[in-house]
Structures are given as C-alpha cells and as structure tokens.
Amino acid sequence: MIKSFKDKNLEKCWRTNQCNKFRTDLVRRVLMKLDLMDAATCLDDLKNPPSNRLHPLHGPEYKNCWAISVNGPWRLIFCFENEGIFDVRLEQYH
C-alpha cells in the first residue's frame, strides 16, 4: 500500500486524476502502475507483470529503495518497508 509520495504532483495525479504536469503518453501507464503498487502487500506482488522489471537501487541515498519500469527511461522509484511503500516519485533514467 502506498503510504507517501515524494513528488506532490504525482500524488495529486493519482488521487484526483489532474495530471497536467505529466506527459500525456505516460499518464495511463503511471496510474496503472500506481494502482498495482497500492494493492501490493509485499515486493513479490510487484514482480508481475514482468514488464515492471522490479529492481533494487544502489547507493546510500537509495537505502531500501526499488524501481519499476513505466515506459522507456521512465521509472517509478519508491522505498519499501514492512508497513508499505513510501516516497514514491517518477524519474527519468539517463
């Protein structure tokens, strides 16, 4: 379950469907992935579909953080702890 967002525009998009801050070609997939994340009770729940490409992030600033693919270089980044998913944000790799 999603507990918090690091990106307030992303939170607004998910909660209200007011997504004018994001590229229109990404919105549908981002919202679908956020719904999957909110329904997840453990990390294994995010391994399917395989196109999520769930993977851990490395580095001191990414302790307990993971990413799933959205589209091309876009990823949803989040931290996972027993209580749920925290600090969700959308980032473009590269």
Predicted regions, residues:
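Arg/Lys-rich, positively charged N-terminal/basic patches that mediate binding to nucleic acids
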Residues: 1-33
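A short, surface-exposed loop/turn module that caps and links secondary-structure elements
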Residues: 42-66
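Short, solvent-exposed, low-complexity loop/linker segments
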Residues: 25-51
